[in-house]
Amino acid sequence: YEKIDRCNMVIDAENDVACDNDEDRALLRHVMGECHYLRATYYFTLVNLYAKPYVPSTAESTPGVPVKTSSKVEDKEYTRASVAEVYRQILADLDAAETDLKDVKSPATIYHVGIDAVYIFRSRVEMFMQEWQKAADDAKRALDEDSYLQNLVGWKDGYPISSDNKEVVYSNGASCFGNIVFLAPGKKSNYDSP
């Protein structure tokens, strides 16, 4: 919720930012798009950690997590929104991110959100919601933006999930990939060049 609050602060301050030229306006759009995207990912993580899975027939009555979309300090007790309400907020944030990022130049690094990351993540959310056709449509939009494949044949060292891998469209931080991926003894040969 601390990270959500930071996103809320930036989103709430949008109208306080003076943009004197197109470059400033594009930067503001990018920042707003990233904040909406990040807030969606944080709520997605929370609802999937602390609530039951999304089931279309019960999502409206299944307790989710509290939703707060304002940075204002309020003296009140927040109650859990339904799983459906949380997912609606996630999709609303992703729609806002799409609006903000669709005409913005793609980021130069994987550490900033681009439109392809929005499509990929929305596709994932829609899969969790069992909205199969919508998920397929957003996945196709992402592939239409960028459809690179990394050839792992002959890969010998380094990390396949890195900033120079064309398949990675967004990375939120860093990971110690070598500590979480293991190959069974004798299986590395499955990835050697033919």
Q: What does each model-found stretch correspond to?
A:
Residues 1-50, 81, 98-103:
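Conserved, well-structured interaction surfaces
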Residues 130, 136-194:
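Hydrophobic-face positions in mid-chain alpha helices that act as interaction patches
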Residues 33-73:
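Extended ligand-binding groove/face enriched in aromatic
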Residues 47-54, 105-106, 128-131:
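Short coil/turn linking the two alpha-helices of tandem helical-hairpin repeats
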